[in-house]
Amino acid sequence: MEREQFKVLVKAMKAVYAQPTFIPDQDAFNVWFALLRDLPYKQAELAVQKHMATEKFPPTIADIREKA
């Protein structure tokens, strides 16, 4: 997935999980992107959507990878 595509996913997750500690800065964004960029965008998008629809708390990187 491309960086701009990941940005879209982060915006969606931040809208659903309005917690200031969830991916709080550029450094955190870079770590998350580095660990998820190998996933195809569509696969990551579906995993994020599934998590947002079924979980009360924000995902971890592992949660997204497991659902992908």
Predicted regions and their residues:
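Charged interaction scaffolds used for protein-protein
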Residues: 1-68
